[in-house]
Design a protein with these regions (language model features):
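A conserved beta-strand-loop-helix scaffold within acyl/acetyltransferase catalytic domains
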Residues: 1-2, 32, 36-54, 66-80, ...
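A short, internal acetyl-CoA/4′-phosphopantetheine-binding micro-motif in the GNAT/acyltransferase core
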Residues: 7-15, 27, 167-178
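Conserved catalytic-core motifs of GNAT/GCN5-like acyltransferases
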Residues: 55-62
Length: 203
């Protein structure tokens, strides 16, 4: 078996390095293999000092937001997707944390329908899963059509306007084609308007 840590430790470097070693010691005590998933370059040497190897599984996709827009030839596909959503009656808004509890029944229904359509269970770990207590801690981006929520994503917001990302994304089966494209384009535009530097699309 394996003991898997998601991402790197958060805190001062000297404390973080000690925590990485502590994870290795705990893995050894339990007879498990230590795995550090989705790490950056900061502590590579520490992982190598543990006797671990580095395996590249992918790269994090980052969208710079400070100059993001829909103008120009290079953004024609995005502009068309956004216009198609607007013509199809889609609208976007971000529900603040205070509003989220009242939205949870509808979000749960959307999530259940989405899972049923995918014929699977929640994945969890590196992908978000539906948990009402967890969702209620974040603003939620909503796409609506004819006054009904057709897609949503919770927002992760780094301090000081550094980074924006999403963890859980779901949509109704009958959502108009291109709904998720519309959601992400609107998120990029919203993030720029709020002063965020970048949007992480994950690996």
């Amino acid at each position: 078996g394996s003991l898997i840590a998601m991402g790197e430790p958060v805190g001062p470097p000297e404390v973080a390095r000690a925590l990485i070693w502590r994870c290795r010691e705990e893995s050894d005590r339990l007879g498990l293999r230590p795995v550090f998933y989705q790490i950056g370059e900061t502590y590579w040497q520490t992982y190598l000092d543990l006797g671990l190897g580095l395996v590249k599984l992918g790269e994090e996709a980052i969208v710079p937001l400070h100059d993001f827009g829909l103008e120009g030839r290079e953004r024609a596909d995005l502009r068309q997707a956004w216009n198609r959503g607007k013509r199809g009656g889609l609208s976007f808004r971000v529900a603040p944390v205070e509003e989220v509890p009242s939205l949870l029944p509808r979000l749960h229904a959307i999530s259940n329908a989405w899972l049923e359509d995918k014929a699977g269970d929640e994945k969890g770990f590196s992908l978000g899963s539906y948990d009402p207590d967890y969702l209620a801690r974040f603003p939620v981006a909503l796409v609506e059509a004819e006054g009904q929520i057709v897609a949503f994503a919770n927002l992760w917001q780094a301090p000081a306007g550094a980074e924006l990302s999403v963890d859980l994304m779901r949509h109704v089966n009958e959502a108009p084609k291109g709904t998720m494209d519309f959601l992400f384009i609107e998120l990029f535009l919203w993030g720029r308007s709020q002063g965020y530097a970048r949007f992480s699309l994950g690996m």
